[in-house]
Amino acid sequence: MNKGAPIRVVLFGVGVIGSGVLRLARTRPGVEIVGAVVRDARLEGRPLEEIVPDGPTGLRLSADGARVLSEMRPEVVVIATRSTLPEVLPTLRLAAKARTAIACTAEELAYILPGDGPEAAEIFGLAESHQVPIVAVGLNPGFVLDVWPLLLASIAHDVSAIDAERAVDLSGFGPNVRASLGVGYSATDFDRELARGKIAGHRGFRESLRLIGEAVGRPVDETNVRTSPIFAKRARELIGGELSPGQTAGVRQLATGTSAGVQWLRLTMTASVALDEIGVEPVDRVHLSGSNDLTAIISPGSRAVPSTVGRIVNAIPKVATAAPGVHSAADLGLTPARAVR
């Protein structure tokens, strides 16, 4: 990396989050987007400005990630595509073989160990064999329900229990993300798709629980996640679709972590396009129980899309200089936005 030169970045994924990354990165003199990779081969060669009018100029979309990495030689690859390890593993392989630092938003990457399965073992192997950092970045997991409680724990005397909650408005997301979060189903379809795994609600609860447990010296040996639907009371126009009364408007979820038979971690998520109908305001809240109880609140809550985008772009300089290996979001340290002059 040339000292003083912008960090060269290739982005995989130009959805809602990826588009936001492109827009914000354009305002950062220390970051230069040199490539944008999409899955849809029909978009090959199209000017990026046609998809993201207020993003970087002079770039064309490509569905050939290997070629883009070879030609553009980025210092950082940002992967903002899918949620699970099997889904992002092919892109992680490409980026690691290109020997570039990697920032990835996949929720299942937020906290992994080599023994967590074949995909996790391969990811650790990629980082070691190619001597690159693979860094988990994101808002949740990655900040609200894990890193933020740990920051608060920095001023605690001890921690006997943690209770964190998040209420988030989903109306800023497109139809694919909404569907995975449980929006737009009948009651019967919701139950079926939840059982099949198509509806995940919030992914990353288990990763956040394990991350917190390891960080405070009380490893979690049992996790549990319960999910229930929220139903719409009236029709709503949404991005790329509409919602009818009686369809699901989102989910309520409770995740718990237990250590040696003691449940001491509770993470709660209310995610809906109709928070107003259930009398809930967007909010992030964490309460630490201990010798000196602590409570912190972000109100009206960190908005999902812009806050995730900020978390990613602000992390790029740290990712570029990270040591080789697999890093959780807690390993990043502070990544504040730059002051406006």
Locate the predicted segments by residue.
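C-terminal helical cap and adjacent loop that interface with cofactors, partners, or active-site loops
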Residues: 274-341
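Active-site-lining helix/loop region of Rossmann-like oxidoreductase modules
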Residues: 12, 153-284, 302, 314
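N-terminal Rossmann-like dinucleotide-binding module
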Residues: 1-52
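Rossmann-fold NAD(P) dinucleotide-binding segment
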Residues: 67-76, 85-107
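Conserved N-terminal Rossmann-fold NAD(P) cofactor-binding segment
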Residues: 40-72
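Alpha-helical support elements that line or immediately flank enzyme active sites
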Residues: 143-155
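Short, ordered loop/turn segments at secondary-structure junctions
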Residues: 39-41, 82, 106-110, 139-140, ...
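Rossmann-fold NAD(P)-binding glycine/threonine-rich loop
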Residues: 106-132
